Amino acid sequence: MANALASATCERCKGGFAPAEKIVNSNGELYHEQCFVCAQCFQQFPEGLFYEFEGRKYCEHDFQMLFAPCCHQCGEFIIGRVIKAMNNSWHPECFRCDLCQEVLADIGFVKNAGRHLCRPCHNREKARGLGKYICQKCHAIIDEQPLIFKNDPYHPDHFNCANCGKELTADARELKGELYCLPCHDKMGVPICGACRRPIEGRVVNAMGKQWHVEHFVCAKCEKPFLGHRHYERKGLAYCETHYNQLFGDVCFHCNRVIEGDVVSALNKAWCVSCFACSTCNTKLTLKNKFVEFDMKPVCKKCYEKFPLELKKRLKKLSETLGRK
């Protein structure tokens, strides 16, 4: 053993070992105690903990900064298993159903209106609009189209027109707490909502050549009422400003709002002039400033120079690879 150590050399400095010197053995590799350090910061490993990547050893902090992705939910670095979903990275325990909070890592998920849902929740959401109504008078299932009276569903044949006495159909109209057949109702000159096809007794919205209940004149994308705010029309549908521009115009990558005025086009994205800034120090940038892309966001030259050397090498290599494509 003594003869073996006499001929052994330090893996880092290639120097020999003194007879009584303390030696660090890491997976068969021998080091002087002062040579067993992080490849990035050259400091000894706290509590002996290190991470190895491509033959180099790093302390936990530098390994996270250089190689570990950040969790979209908690913002912490991910060491170990990474879930890649919805264009983001997640800890397995952080990737949960948006409705019931069930962990999705091992059971799979379904995209639903921008949400990640477990299959039971997705199926319930999908089936919500497929269920049949129950008559609030006889409590039997309504197989055909229901008559909605005071926000409750009924079989139409339970009612008669308050004017002519005819048995009603699902086309009946409610006015001031009474039900009327369609011909009798139309003779009263009451406006009909373009969405629900029911009479409008209160405020009327006149738009797109039709009349609407205030709460029924909504954005075709988010279904929120306009409530007097400006709407934008396209192919017979109305959109709020945000979703009209999101679907047919420019939305700022940073603030996710409609870009009013000049658009900064950089990194294959659109930005408000006031939002285009260094993602590290928030210094405002223009296209005349020098900046680099990091995590799909701009970083000014001053902040870039403070990056660890290994990280800058990675970014340069990535930039050269993309430039050749």
Curated annotation (Swiss-Prot):
The keyword Membrane applies. Keywords: Acetylation, Actin-binding, Cell junction, Cell membrane, LIM domain, Membrane, Metal-binding, Repeat, Zinc. It is a peripheral membrane protein. Its main location: other. Transmembrane segments: none annotated. It comes from the Eukaryota. GO terms for biological process: cell-cell adhesion; cell-cell junction organization; cell-matrix adhesion; cholangiocyte proliferation; chordate embryonic development; establishment or maintenance of cell polarity; hepatocyte apoptotic process; integrin-mediated signaling pathway. GO terms for cellular component: focal adhesion; plasma membrane. It is found in: Cell junction, Focal adhesion; Cell membrane. The modification N-acetylalanine is found at residue 2. It holds the Pfam family LIM. Within the IPP (ILK-PINCH-PARVIN) complex, binds to F-actin, promoting F-actin bundling, a process required to generate force for actin cytoskeleton reorganization and subsequent dynamic cell adhesion events such as cell spreading and migration. Component of the heterotrimeric IPP (ILK-PINCH-PARVIN) complex composed of ILK, LIMS1/PINCH and PARVA; the complex binds to F-actin via the C-terminal tail of LIMS1 and the N-terminal region of PARVA, promoting F-actin filament bundling. Formation of the IPP complex is dependent on protein kinase C and precedes integrin-mediated cell adhesion and spreading. Competes with LIMS2 for interaction with ILK. Interacts with SH3/SH2 adapter NCK2, thereby linking the complex to cell surface receptors. Interacts (via LIM zinc-binding 5) with TGFB1I1. This is LIM and senescent cell antigen-like-containing domain protein 1. It comes from Mus musculus (Mouse).
